[in-house]
C-alpha cells in the first residue's frame, strides 16, 4: 500500500435503465469475472420480480433496502499498551454504502432460492421490510459497537 498518494476516486456512470449511480455500483458488486451483462441481467431481473410482487417502483424498494442495511457505527481494533480494544467509530458515507451493498449481495448469495435473480429480489424485499440476513448483519455490528461503548474515548 503506497503511503504517498491515495487512489483517485473514479467517476461511476449511471446505469442505462434507471440513470442511478448506486444501481451501477450495486451491479458492479454483483459482477463476477468482468461479466457485466450477466450482472446487469441479474439485477434488472431482480428488479422486475420486485415490481411484479409489490407493484411499486423497484428503485424505491432498493433504496429502502439499502438504507435499512447501511451501518452508522462500527468497531475498529486499536492497540493500547499491549491490549487490543474494539473501539466504536462512525462510518463514513462512502464506506456505509459499500458495506450495505456488500452485505446485501453476500446475504443474497447465501439464500436457498434457485437462481441468483430470485435470491437477490427476495433479499432486497426482506431488507426493505427490516428482515433478512443483511439487516441482521447490520444489527450485529451495531450491537458490537454498543457493547464496546466504554472504549469510545480511544477513538482516533
Swiss-Prot record:
CC terms in the record's Gene Ontology section: small ribosomal subunit
UniProt entry tagged with the keyword tRNA-binding: yes
Keywords from the named record: Ribonucleoprotein, Ribosomal protein, RNA-binding, rRNA-binding, tRNA-binding
Signal sequence range: none
A biological-process GO annotation: translation
Gene3D superfamilies (alphabetical): Ribosomal protein S7 domain
Domain of life assignment: Bacteria
PROSITE patterns: RIBOSOMAL_S7
Subunit structure: Part of the 30S ribosomal subunit. Contacts proteins S9 and S11.
Record's protein name: Small ribosomal subunit protein uS7
Originating species: Bradyrhizobium sp. (strain BTAi1 / ATCC BAA-1182)
